[in-house]
Amino acid sequence: MFNRAVSRLSRKRPPSDIHDSDGSSSSSHQSLKSTAKWAASLENLLEDPEGVKRFREFLKKEFSEENVLFWLACEDFKKMQDKTQMQEKAKEIYMTFLSSKASSQVNVEGQSRLNEKILEEPHPLMFQKLQDQIFNLMKYDSYSRFLKSDLFLKHKRTEEEEEDLPDAQTAAKRASRIYNT
C-alpha cells in the first residue's frame, strides 16, 4: 500500500518537478517551494490547492473561513456558461454569504450588497466588486497573520527538512503526510 501511495504521488507531480534538464532526479531543486510561492502573494496562495487548504485551516481557527469560501465560490461562478446553472449558483452564493439570513455571511459594505432581483439575470462578473472587497480584506488582514502563523511556519519547516532528504525519503515522507492528514 505504501509503495502505491508513493507511486501515485510521483505520477501527480509534473515532469519538471521530477527531473532537471540534464535528466537527473532532484527533489531539492523544485522550481520554488510552495511556502515561498504562498509568501510571495495571496494570489499564488489561492492558485495552489494545498495553499487554499492550509489557508482555510487557518481561517477556520480565526472564525473567518467564509471569506475564502466566498472568494472560491465567486471564482467558480465566473467560469460557468449555462444560464440556469448560473442562476442557481448566484442564488446559492447570495443565500450562503450575502443575505441578512446567510449561514456564512461575509463582511461587505452595506451599499455593496446585492438586491435579490438581480439574481434573476446573472452575469459572470456580478459578484466581482464584492469578491474584490473580500480579497482585499483577506490580503491586508488574514493573509499577513497566516504568514506568521504556526500552521504556515510548520509547513515551511517541513519543506526545508524535506529539501535535505534523498528523493526516496522525501517521496515517502510526503506520502505519509498526505495519507495521515
UniProtKB/Swiss-Prot annotation:
Keywords: Cytoplasm, GTPase activation, Lipoprotein, Nucleus, Palmitate, Phosphoprotein, Signal transduction inhibitor. Coiled coil: none annotated. One of its GO terms (biological process) is regulation of G protein-coupled receptor signaling pathway. Residues 23-32 have a biased composition (Low complexity). Interacts with GNAZ, GNAI1 and GNAI3. Associates specifically with the activated, GTP-bound forms of GNAZ and GNAI3. It comes from Homo sapiens (Human). It is found in: Nucleus. Residues 41-156 form the RGS domain. The modification Phosphoserine is found at residues 24, 41, 176. Its main location: nucleus. CDD domains: RGS_RGS10 (cd08741). A lipid is attached at residue 74 (S-palmitoyl cysteine). Residues 1-32, 158-181 are annotated as: Disordered. GO terms for molecular function: G-protein alpha-subunit binding; GTPase activator activity; GTPase activity. The gene is RGS10. The keyword Nucleus applies. GO terms for cellular component: cytosol; nuclear body; nucleoplasm; nucleus; plasma membrane; synapse. Regulates G protein-coupled receptor signaling cascades, including signaling downstream of the muscarinic acetylcholine receptor CHRM2. Inhibits signal transduction by increasing the GTPase activity of G protein alpha subunits, thereby driving them into their inactive GDP-bound form. Modulates the activity of potassium channels that are activated in response to CHRM2 signaling. Activity on GNAZ is inhibited by palmitoylation of the G-protein. This is Regulator of G-protein signaling 10.
